[in-house]
From Swiss-Prot:
GO terms for biological process: ribosomal small subunit biogenesis; translation. NCBIfam families: PRK05327.1, rpsD_bact. Signal peptide: none annotated. One of the primary rRNA binding proteins, it binds directly to 16S rRNA where it nucleates assembly of the body of the 30S subunit. Keywords: Ribonucleoprotein, Ribosomal protein, RNA-binding, rRNA-binding. This is Small ribosomal subunit protein uS4. Belongs to the universal ribosomal protein uS4 family. One of its GO terms (cellular component) is small ribosomal subunit. Part of the 30S ribosomal subunit. Contacts protein S5. The interaction surface between S4 and S5 is involved in control of translational fidelity.
Length: 195
């Protein structure tokens, strides 16, 4: 699967919830899945629910299959609950932190900000969206783009902080499962990959 650049509403309708973070009028009108009406009556198997959950997390964070598989293997090598560690790895990506700090309106926009070299981590420019942050890292926009920063509420709660005077965000600690707001059942993903 290559990077998806098609209609975002179709993806949101497929899962029955907003995936890309923005509210969408066309999603509000048609909350049923896209496609033929006869295809909606087919009974879902357990495998299909597992697959949909995996696709949901990949679309939510903008990750392709190979990179997601590497993240799963990395999570399975660490001590703890695999699914929770997998979500923590997704949440600690630079593009996601830029979105959570409210420096962008969506994750694809955050990804573009990072790849266009507008974001600095600890004073150094980083242009890799999948860059994993460590607790204590400081994230900010480059000097000439600091006026564009949204001074609104953070989308991540306790584990991020934003200083309006210095225009610097701090990744305080890795969030636990209760602090991750995404509606993802990580147990189904672990079961799918553990076959």
């Amino acid at each position: 699967m290559a990077r998806y650049i098609g209609p975002k509403t179709k993806i949101s309708r497929k899962f029955g919830e907003l995936i890309y973070g923005k509210t969408n009028k066309s999603f509000e009108k048609k909350k049923y899945p896209p496609g033929n009406s006869s295809s909606r009556n087919i009974k879902k198997t357990f495998y299909s629910t597992q697959l949909l959950e995996k696709q949901k997390i990949k679309y939510t964070y903008g990750i392709l299959e190979r990179q997601f598989l590497k993240m799963f293997y990395k999570a399975s090598k660490k001590k703890g609950i695999k699914g929770e560690i997998l979500l923590q790895l997704c949440e600690s990506r630079l593009d996601n932190i830029v979105y959570r700090l409210n420096l962008s309106h969506s994750r694809p926009e955050a990804r573009q900000l990072v790849s266009h070299r507008h974001i600095t981590v600890n004073g150094k420019i980083v242009n890799i969206p999948s860059f994993n942050l460590k607790p204590g890292d400081k994230i900010s926009l480059k000097e000439k783009h600091k006026h564009k920063a949204n001074k609104n509420k953070l989308l991540g709660s306790d584990w991020l902080s934003w200083d309006n005077e210095k225009m610097i965000g701090i990744f305080k600690y890795i969030p636990n499962r209760n602090q991750i707001t995404e509606n993802i059942n990580e147990k189904l993903i672990v079961e799918l990959y553990s076959k």
